[in-house]
Structures are given as structure tokens and as C-alpha cells.
Regions:
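Conserved active-site segment immediately N-terminal to the catalytic lysine
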Residues: 173-207, 236-241
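N-terminal "arm"/small-domain region of PLP-dependent enzymes with the aminotransferase-like
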Residues: 1-34, 401
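Glycine-/small-residue-rich active-site loops that bind phosphorylated ligands and cofactors
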Residues: 17, 100, 123-124, 152, ...
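Phosphate-binding glycine-rich loop
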Residues: 37-93, 107, 117-119, 186
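PLP-dependent aminotransferase class I/II
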Residues: 42-46, 51-57, 130, 134, ...
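PLP-dependent aminotransferase-like
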Residues: 76-150, 154-166, 170-175, 182
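Active-site PLP attachment segment
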Residues: 190-228, 251-256
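Structural detector of well-ordered beta-strand residues that form the stable sheet scaffold
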Residues: 95, 116, 171-172, 196, ...
Length: 423
């Protein structure tokens, strides 16, 4: 069968609009509530808190803003108020998911902390509890863990929380990618001490931008709300007694989120159907899909991902910004598949490049299940060496077109394109 390029691009994940969004945006404009207060903001804060299962929600300009204020709050709770012109994490280490987008990590740097990256495990591709326990052995004074749920798949939360509780550490939950996912029947975004979600344009629910901080503490919610409005004091004039930020969500962005929220379950179901069609369509190929804990979790299936078996990988070499490969019959690699998808006007993406491999963070500590991942032979490394799980998944994996508006017929063509790479 001859495959022709798609006339209309098949996206990785683009917004899925329904029309309700326009209603609430128009209302904001018609009533002149277009700034950072209004009925849309009030509504989405109530709706998200109810959906996720927390008492309070604070609407913010983006998920990164939520993560920043969550990290700042955790730092103040553990270490107290910082000195003037210093972050709350000055001189402190924070354990952080390694295979993630850098928005998970950057807020640690905003607060002058040092991220210690924790390797992934193969069951969910998330933070490895074994590596986390190793990290506490090596950095026993660390008291904050930044945990992300990769591609909408919940991490092994109970194991991670038990380790954190043992060491007196707080969890900042980065649920930016996992709104609608559940772990043991609880929504992600409600599991940590401080919780954050994102409404970026590619997320399962979007406001074009936007994010939210979630908590069961009114005191914490009030603190984050104050910080997000430039830390204005309750005074007759503009009074500021601590550093603040312009992190507020606009009532227009909130209108888009408000129109999206009734469709959360529908979006999750569509994403799951995409995942299942890929899984069925790849039968017989030397590949696996991004895994999850079937017994304890239900992902939101935000992005469907593919992992090529080790013995089915052709030669692939990656530099800082480019990649080369040599095609071999019966074998392929992420670079070849992504190039072929692009040729047919479909968008894929490499797996998140692990943070310990990023140029900006190459001097930060990195801990694997065997110990220090920066030193391949020392007292912390077992005799069989150090396995870098995240680097391996990055080398052999890719994100597939996962757009809700992709039809089953279009997805079947995507599957055929990928199958052809193994010929």
C-alpha cells in the first residue's frame, strides 16, 4: 500500500476544543473581567479542587509558577524564612525526578537549591524508590523530594512516600502531565504535601496556558495566593514585606479551562483508546509501550510512547543537537522513526532527555539504584556496574502522535509507517 503524506498534520498533542470555552471567554470580555480576578477563576479553582480531591486550589499563570511556589513553600516550612536576596533552598539539596521536562527542575534553581537527580525504574519510567533510598543514604540531610508523573503515568507513590516519611522529607508532586490519572483510586495532584498541575496548550485540559497549586491547607493556599500577587500586604497603600511574583492566571485563560473541564473524562478515554490501538497495532514488532502499574494505577495516557527492544536497535549516535543513524534491515531507532513520521506530516518527539544529561545540569549529582551514577566505579557501585535506566529509555524510546483529534484510520496509517521502519 502506498502511503501518502497527511494533508492535515497529525500532531503529538494539540488542544481539543468544544465550543464551551468561547462562551466563558466571551462572558469575561463582555463583563470587562479580563484581568486576574473574575467568575471564571473562582469557578475553575472550585472545580479543580473538587475533581482532584483537595480542599483548596490557587489558579496561576503556568504550571512552572505552581512548582516554583510549591518549592518555595516547602523550603520555608523546612528551613524557615530565607535571608534577604537568597532563595529558601540556599545551600540545600533537593531530590528530583531525572527523566522529566526541565520545568520540574528549574524552580529548585530559582530558590538557590541544588537538584540531585534520581534515576527512573522500568515499571512506570518514574522515580525509582530503590534509587531514592540510596540517595537518602548518601544525602541524609535532604528534606524535599520533587516527584513527577511521566507522560500521565503515576509513579510508585506509596513506596516513595514511605521512604520520605522515614527520612522526614516533604513531597512536591508535579502532576503537570497527569491530570485525570489515579493512583489507588486517588487523583494525582492530591497525593503530595504540595501539588501542581498544568494547563499548557498540549495538556489533556488546556487554557492555552495556566497552572494550579493544590493543597488541603488554607494557610498554604493563602500564602501562595499572596506570593502570586506580588506579596501585597493588607494595607491602605502598596506595602511589601517579602518577595512576590506576578504569577496570576487571567480570567480569560480561566474561561478556556472552565469550558474544557466538563470534558476531562472524555479526553482521558480518547487518549486511552489511542494507547490501546497502538498496543494492538504493534503486535509482532520488537517493541513495548510505556508501562504502568495495572494493579494500582490508571494513567490519563497523555502521550503514548514506544520503546524499541535492545536487539532491534540500529546504530544511532546523538550529539548535543543532532543525531545520526544507519538503517539496518529488521531494525530501526527513534531518529529514523521520527524522521519518517515527519516526512508524512506527523509529529512525534524523543523521550525527555534525562536532566542529568542536560548541559546545564551535568555537574549535579545523579543517583541510580546502584549508587552514584556520576562515578561508574566506587564504593557505592555494585559489582555488576551502574545501570542508567533513564539514559537507556531516552536512547531507545520516542513519543508517538497522540492527538485526540486523530482518527482511527489516521492512526492505522501511523502504525503502518512505523512498521515500515523495521523492513
Amino acid at each position: 500500500m502506498e502511503i501518502k503524506p497527511f494533508e492535515k498534520k497529525i500532531w503529538l498533542a494539540s488542544p481539543t476544543m468544544h465550543g464551551d470555552e468561547q462562551k466563558w471567554v466571551d462572558e469575561a470580555i463582555q463583563t470587562n473581567w479580563v484581568s486576574t480576578v473574575g467568575a471564571n477563576i473562582n469557578s475553575v479553582e472550585e472545580d479543580i479542587a473538587k475533581t482532584v480531591g483537595t480542599k483548596y486550589a490557587v489558579a496561576l499563570s503556568c504550571g512552572t509558577a505552581a512548582l516554583h511556589l510549591a518549592v518555595k513553600l516547602a523550603g520555608e516550612r523546612i528551613y524557615g524564612m530565607p535571608k534577604p536576596n537568597e532563595g529558601t533552598l540556599k545551600g540545600k539539596t533537593i531530590f528530583c525526578t531525572d527523566m522529566t521536562f526541565d520545568a520540574t527542575v528549574n524552580p529548585i534553581a530559582y530558590e538557590d537549591g541544588e537538584a540531585v537527580f534520581i534515576d527512573s525504574e522500568r515499571d512506570t519510567w518514574n522515580m525509582d524508590p530503590v534509587a531514592l533510598e540510596r540517595a537518602f543514604d548518601m544525602y541524609p540531610d535532604t528534606k524535599i523530594v520533587m516527584l513527577a508523573h511521566l507522560y500521565g503515568t503515576p509513579a510508585k507513590f506509596d513506596e516513595i512516600k514511605a521512604i520520605c516519611d522515614k527520612h522526614g522529607a516533604l513531597i512536591v508532586e508535579d502532576a503537570a502531565e497527569s491530570l485525570g490519572a489515579t493512583y489507588k483510586s486517588k487523583q494525582t495532584g492530591s497525593l503530595g504535601d504540595y501539588n501542581c498541575i498544568s494547563f499548557n496548550g498540549n495538556k489533556i485540559i488546556t487554557g492555552s496556558s495556566g497552572g494550579m497549586f493544590l493543597t488541603n491547607s488554607k494557610e498554604d493556599a493563602d500564602k501562595v495566593r499572596k506570593w502570586s500577587t506580588q506579596s501585597r500586604e493588607d494595607a491602605a497603600w502598596y506595602q511589601h514585606e517579602e518577595i512576590g511574583y506576578n504569577y496570576r492566571m487571567s480570567n480569560i485563560v480561566a474561561g478556556v479551562v472552565r469550558g474544557q473541564m466538563p470534558y476531562l473524562s472524555e479526553h482521558v478515554s480518547a487518549k486511552k483508546a489511542i494507547y490501546e490501538r497502538y498496543k494492538e497495532g504493534f503486535k509482532g514488532l520488537p517493541v513495548t509501550m510505556n508501562p504502568y502499574d495495572v494493579a494500582n494505577s490508571e494513567p490519563n495516557f497523555w502521550l503514548s510512547c514506544l520503546l524499541i527492544n535492545e536487539d532491534a536497535m540500529c546504530k544511532q549516535v546523538r550529539g548535543e543537537k543532532d543525531a545520526l543513524y544507519i538503517h539496518e534491515q529488521g531494525k530501526t531507532c527513534p531518529t529514523e522513526i521520527l524522521e519518517k513520521l515527519a516526512k508524512y506530516n506527523a509529529e512525534g518527539r524523543p523521550i525527555w532527555k534525562p536532566m542529568h544529561m542536560q548541559p546545564i545540569y551535568r555537574t549535579n549529582p545523579f543517583i541510580t539504584a546502584q549508587g552514584n551514577g556520576r562515578a561508574r566505579s566506587n564504593a557505592y557501585i555494585a559489582e555488576n556496574g551502574c545501570e542508567d535506566v533513564g539514559a537507556d529509555i531516552f536512547q531507545r524510546g520516542l513519543c508517538l502522535p497522540s492527538d485526540n483529534k486523530m482518527t482511527a484510520e489516521e492512526q492505522e496509517i501511523i502504525i503502518q509507517i512505523i512498521r515500515s521502519c523495521f523492513e
